[in-house]
Structure formats: C-alpha cells, structure tokens
Curated annotation (Swiss-Prot):
It comes from the Eukaryota. This is Zinc transporter zipt-7.2. It comes from Caenorhabditis elegans. It holds the Pfam family Zip. Residues 39-134, 219-239, 270-307 are annotated as: Disordered. The keyword Nuclease does not apply.
C-alpha cells in the first residue's frame, strides 16, 4: 500500500513538471501566446509603471512588445488626455527602434501603424473644427439675397456702426411723437415744465456722473489704466495737474456759455428793446387817453418777449453742446464695433438709454423757445450729424480706441459738462421757479430726481 502511494505521488510530480515544461516551451516558441499571456497577466503592471517596466526588461523583446501593446491600449482608453498619451506612446515606439530583433521590428511597425491611424483621426477632428469655425465667422449670412454683401467683414463693420448711430439718433424722435405737446401754450405749460425739470436733471446727472468722471483718471474705464500708469511714472504731480485741468475746463465751459449768451442777449436785446420802446412812446404821443392801457400791455408783452429771446439763446447753446457730446458718442460707437459686434451692440444700447433724457430735455427747451413740435423734432435731428461724423472718423482711424480715449481725456468732455451745468442751472431751472403750486413743485422735483437717477444707473452699468 505504501509502495502504491509513493508511485502515485511520483506520477503526479512528473505530470506537473511536464505541464510546466510544456508551458515554458510554448511561451518561448509561440509569440502570439506570449503577447496574450503577458498582456493579460501583466497589463496592470505595464500600465501603472510603463517606463519602469520598459527599463527593467532588458533585452527581452517579448516583454517589450507586450508593454508596447499595453501602452497602446492605455493611450486609446484614456481619451481625456489625447495629446499627453499620444506623445508618450511615440517615445515608447522610439525606444523600440533601438532593438534589432526581427520580431520586435514587426511589433514596432504594427505599433507605429496604430499610432499613425490614431494621429490621422486627430487631424480629421481638427479639420472638422476648423471648418466649423470658418463657417461661423466667414459665412455669417448664408442667404443668396440682399444680405449676402454683409459677409464682407469691412462692409459689415460700416453697416453695423452707421446703422447703430442712426438708430440712436432716430429712436428718441419716436418717443417724442407720443408726448402730448404741440406748442408752448398755457394748457401744456405744467407738463412742459415737468419735461424741463426732467431734462435739467438729465443734464446735471450727465455732467457730474458721466462726463466729468470719464475725463478724470479715476473713472476713465479702459483708459484709466494707461493714464494712471503714466501718472505714476511721472510722479503724483501729473495726476493732480490733470485733475486741475478737468476742473478748469468745466469752469471754462460755464464761463464760455455765459459769455455767448450775454453777447447774444445784448445784440438782440438792444434791437428788441428799442423797437418796444419806440412803439410805446409813439402810441403815447398819438393817443394820450390810451396811454395807461398801452403801457400795461407793453409791460406784459415785453417780459415774455425777453424771456422768449433768453430761452432761444439757451436752445441754441444746448444744441451746440449736444452736438459736441454726440460727436464723442459717435467716436465711442465706431471704436466699439471695431472691437467686436457684441461690444458695439452693448455700447449702442448704453448710449441710446443715455440719450433719451437728453432728447426729451432738448425737446422741452425748443418748445419753450417757441418752436412747434414738428420743427423741434427736425432740429433735434441736426445733432445726429455730430454722432455720424464722430462714427465715420472713428472708422477711418487706424487706432479707433486710442482716438476715443484721447477724446475722452481731452478738454472736450469737461468743457461740454460745464455747458450742461450752465444750461441746467441758469437757463432751465429758473423757469421752474415761476407760477408753481405745491403739487406742481412736487412733480418737478420728482422729474429732476428721475433724470439724475437714470444717469446714475447708466454710470453704474458703464
């Protein structure tokens, strides 16, 4: 029994040794079996330590081939890092080129072929993205109709910028059509004063919250970084000198508008006063009985005539200041559309909301001057020439951004702000002090605050 057991155990040992020897022989003579076996058994090791396994295998081509296959599978499986894995796999293939074994050369060729195919798919992918991008940028209008000319970038820029400028100039006129005022009559007097109050609030808000901050380095937006850095390079004195110049130009605008109005009133006042005086004295000599009544009528008519002349001068000054202001707005619109369509549209909306209080105030001043509603609206369109000229100059300029920044940092904005302050405080607000009830005063103050608040919102948005 013991002998049989020993024989049986010996037989099992011989069988196990033969199977192991057979397996070793197959591994050494069957490359496909080596690739499958090594790939399945050692895949985790090759993937986890790819470079380490390559250095430790020495001259065994089958282990290196298996490691190459594992690297290929890892490069394809990890799709989130195509560029990194793809380049790493090429380094591995380059290492295989140093081995001269024929089987390794075959595996290396196959490995390189797989990577060539992978690279080709990447090129196709990039080509697809490039075609899609070109389609979106170059062929914005694919119609064969009248809009096809907008596919040209330069034509599209001009059409967009000029159209935006015309829209800003024409849109307030549509709002003015719904204002129930036809002329300066006693019936429309209370509403007209409310509009004058709203316009004066818009002028003051525009001057103190928009024009003056844009002319100073502290609120210069994009230009702030350039002027501020330049100021620090030249010392703090330059910063203070610029602030002083802004205040000086504001005062200069106030004095200039005062001087112009005084000169115009002197010239027109002498003619009107002489005519009124001569007519009064002539009537006094011819008809002594009607002297008192005519003097009373002459006094009543003389004051409205002087007031009308005063407000007409104010209307002309306001149109001149508004023309200059619209010129700077046109420069900004042109530069914005050069920067991009989205930037241009945002700037257009901002300027449009900003211009509505201005146009309503200008309309009220023109109506108060004696113009009819239709004539006042037509005169308002004259100021659109300032915006158009500014936009065209900006589009023709080689550096539109620098041109807009130069206009913003020059004397134009603070000088215009001084004119707006003068018109609001000297010419418009005194009109609100005459013949006002308590309820009318409340409405006028609320209108002034509304105009200022709109400019405040626009300043925050900008």
């Amino acid at each position: 029994m013991l002998v049989k057991s020993c024989i049986f155990l010996s037989f099992l040992a011989i069988a196990a040794y033969g199977q192991a020897h057979l397996k070793y022989t197959k591994e050494m003579n069957d490359p496909e079996y080596v690739q499958q076996n090594v790939h399945h058994q050692g895949h985790g090791h090759a993937h986890g330590g790819h470079g380490h396994a390559h250095d430790a295998d020495g001259g065994c081509p089958y282990a290196k081939a298996a490691a190459a296959e594992a690297a290929t599978a890892a490069a394809h499986d990890h799709g989130h890092a195509h560029d990194h894995d793809h380049g790493h796999a090429h380094d591995h293939g380059h290492a295989h080129d140093h081995h001269g074994h024929s089987h390794d050369e075959e595996e290396d060729h196959h490995h390189g072929h797989a990577h060539d195919h992978h690279g080709h798919s990447h090129e196709d992918h990039g080509h697809s993205h490039g075609a899609e991008s070109a389609k979106q940028v170059g062929d914005e209008y694919q119609y064969t109709g009248f809009l096809s000319f907008l596919n040209d970038a330069k034509t599209r820029l001009w059409v967009y910028a000029i159209s935006a400028t015309l829209l800003i100039s024409a849109a307030p006129c549509f709002i003015l059509m719904f204002i129930p005022i036809q002329a300066n009559t006693s019936e429309s007097g209370p509403l007209l004063k409310v509009l004058l109050a709203f316009g004066s609030g818009g002028l003051l808000g525009d001057a103190f919250l928009h024009l003056i901050p844009h002319a100073t380095p502290a609120g210069d937006g994009h230009g702030h970084s350039h002027s501020h850095g330049h100021s620090h390079g030249g010392g703090g004195h330059s910063h203070g000198a610029h602030d002083m110049s802004v205040g000086g130009w504001v005062l200069g605008g106030i004095i200039a508008f005062l001087t112009v109005e005084k000169l115009v009133r002197i010239l027109r006042g002498e003619d009107g006063h002489g005519h009124s005086h001569g007519h009064s004295h002539g009537g006094e000599k011819k008809e002594t009985k009607e002297k008192d009544s005519k003097d009373k009528v002459a006094k009543k008519e003389e004051k409205p005539e002087k007031d009308e002349q005063s407000i007409k001068v104010t209307a002309y000054l306001n149109l001149a200041a508004d023309f200059t202001h619209n010129f700077t707005d046109g420069l900004a619109i042109g530069a914005s559309f050069i920067a991009g369509t989205t930037v241009g549209i945002v700037t257009m909306i901002t300027v449009l909301v900003h211009e509505v209080p201005h146009e309503i105030g200008d309309f009220a001043i023109l109506i108060q001057s004696g113009y009819s509603k239709k004539k006042a609206m037509l005169i308002q369109l004259v100021t659109a020439l300032g915006a158009l000229s500014g936009c065209v100059i900006s589009l023709f300029s080689a550096d539109a951004d620098a041109l807009a920044d130069a206009a913003a940092s020059s004397w134009v904005l603070p000088f215009t702000a001084g004119g707006f302050i003068y018109i609001a405080t000297v010419s418009v607000i005194p009109e609100l002090l005459e013949n006002s009830s308590f309820f009318q005063t409340v409405k006028e103050i609320f209108a002034i605050l509304t105009g200022i608040f709109l400019m405040y919102l626009i300043a925050i948005y900008e």
